[in-house]
Amino acid sequence: MQVKISDSIKYIGVDDKTIDLFESQYLVPNGISYNSYLIVDEKVAIMDTVDKRKTDEWLENLDRELNGRTPDYLVISHLEPDHASNIKVVSEKYPSMKLVGNAKTFSMLPQFFPDFDFADKTVTVKEGDELELGSHKLTFIMAPMVHWPEVMVSYESAEKVLFSADGFGTFGALDAQEDDWACEARRYYFNICGKYGVQVQNLLKKTAKLDIRKICPLHGPVLDENLGWYIGLYDIWSKYEPETDGVFIAYCSVHGNTAKAAEKLCEIIKSKTDKKVSIADLSRTDLAEDIEDAFRFSRMVVIAPSYDGGVFPIMNDFLHHLKIKGYKNRKVAMVENGSWAPSAA
């Protein structure tokens, strides 16, 4: 898909609409984009590669935008394979090209490419270091655990562009993006980065000092309007604050009786408030969307039957995911159902 950023900053990423599960667990009915960028100046810098599923298409995009030039640098924001799988391929194609990363990047790199010697190809940067490309200049900002330890973002000062790694990313291919950015961005954030709110807050504080006109993430659309709104949502999410004053009812039901109780509760709550109320049968909904809603709302009711001397397994899995993602700062009520040995609560 053609994405216009500027005359000097080119989009060379790809859409993947054949993938069914992102990270082998998140449903992506609209696919995913693997974003990659090219800065063309006196020197040329590639900003990340893409997943190995799309190597050939990415190389075609790169060759087209290079227009006969040779890249001087490959900036590695994030070593996760959906962004770094083609480091070896492009290094072999352009042997004079240098890899730009931080110390953690290069300590981890051999794990992914053990049969390739990068020793004389690396430029190690740290917080605040700059890379001059001509009229464009990149400043590197370390973002450890957003959401891997080697992650860094880059700020291009001439055009005021933040290359934000996985930050501000969304699920969905670029040609299948919904109008509601927040929906897929929220689902992406809480399931991919949600555990690392403190680290996201640290990054937001660093970037607050910058004059940012565009945000170029590694997944999802380039953001170039109303950036304060996007950043504001990230601030809310990473502080673990509710975004919506309302109630999320999450339930499981073996024979339908607990479902009746959940639906009746939903009806009663709706009759007593004008706040938003959402209900989900966890056995039949997307877990990632349920995690998203749990974090979105200010209140949650979990309703489940007893099973094998404990809570129903699907509810147990849901609660486990909330725990590891750092769920807090909400009011929660629990309802258990059990005829002869109630044990869910």
Question: What does each of the following model-derived ranges do?
Answer:
Residues Q2-L62, V153-E156, K160-S164, T258:
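Conserved beta-strand hairpin/beta-sheet module of binuclear metal-dependent hydrolase folds
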Residues K4-D7, G101-E225:
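Metallo-beta-lactamase
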Residues I19, D224, D308-G310:
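Short glycine-rich, flexible loops that bind phosphorylated cofactors or substrates
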Residues E263-S278:
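Short helix-loop-beta junction
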Residues R284-A345:
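Helix-loop-strand module that forms the ligand-binding subsite of alpha/beta enzymes
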